[in-house]
A protein has these predicted regions:
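Short, hydrophobic/aromatic-rich segments at coil-to-beta transitions
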Residues: 1, 47-56, 120
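General beta-strand recognition
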Residues: 28, 53-55, 76-78
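A generic structural micro-feature
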Residues: 10-12, 57-60, 71-73
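Beta-strand elements of well-folded, non-transmembrane domains
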Residues: 22-24, 62, 83-87
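A conserved amphipathic terminal alpha-helix motif
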Residues: 1, 34, 84-125
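Hydrophobic/aromatic beta-strand elements that line small-molecule binding cavities or substrate pockets
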Residues: 19, 43-46, 63-70, 80-81
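Hydrophobic ligand-binding cavity/cleft-lining segments
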Residues: 1-44
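A short, structured loop/turn motif at beta-sheet edges
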Residues: 23-27, 68-76
Length: 125
């Protein structure tokens, strides 16, 4: 993990935002989300549990920010998709149009994984 990736680069243009609430404790949701969105070595990945922030940045234009906060119904996850291309910032949304178009569906898939993982009983041991 490189914490420098937690700072949002400039330019950064908002492309999509989605959010959902999961009825589980924040610490379990955060851990499940981090596991669900960790892209492995092909992308930059940073986690700051104290700030409730997870960042995935890959390629030259793509940046996904997840903010995890307490909610009266459990835990809220806010997803922000950004274009951080530099140079040729204008080309990010063109190159990423499929990812932008599928972001709501993809976020729903992540939420389902997190919901299943965070609602599972912690194993004894």
């Amino acid at each position: 993990m490189n914490s420098s990736y937690l700072r949002r680069p400039t330019p950064a243009t908002l492309l999509r935002e989605h959010q959902s609430v999961i009825g589980a404790p924040l610490d379990r949701v955060f851990a499940a989300l981090a596991a669900a969105v960790d892209p492995g070595p092909e992308s930059h990945f940073a986690v700051d549990p104290a700030a409730g922030m997870i960042v995935v940045q890959g390629g030259w234009w793509y940046r996904a920010e997840y903010l995890v906060t307490a909610d009266s119904a459990g835990t809220r996850i806010q997803f922000t998709l950004l274009n951080v291309a530099s140079p040729a910032h204008w080309a990010g949304p063109i190159t990423g149009r499929a990812a932008i178009r599928s972001s709501a569906h993809d976020f729903g898939d992540v939420i389902e994984k997190v919901r299943l993982s965070s609602s599972a009983s912690p194993s004894a041991g």
